[in-house]
């Protein structure tokens, strides 16, 4: 999921900000849209880091083929726990974590090609912190 502060809007129209797309999905989570974890994982990347990957690949004459642009994948237990830590008003069920015997391992990716582009990326927790701050600045949280 590509998330991060949007470029649309201005300081003059913060009251009209309505999160959409993947930021809308993250906003929905922070507003309590999911109160329990599913046995699945999600991959994240900051929008600015993703854009930097695109530019670096375009500018690199040796770049060809497919490049993944993502930080890593986290299980929903970790995603919701981190969002709750960063945004305490988040409402989750008391036993929100998935605790089945069949708990999955988050999807793993080889980052060698992505890292060859030389772009330093933010971690998921930092991405979430910036998104929450952005929503708060816009009055959406």
What kind of feature is each model-predicted range?
Residues 18-25, 36-56:
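Substrate-positioning beta->alpha
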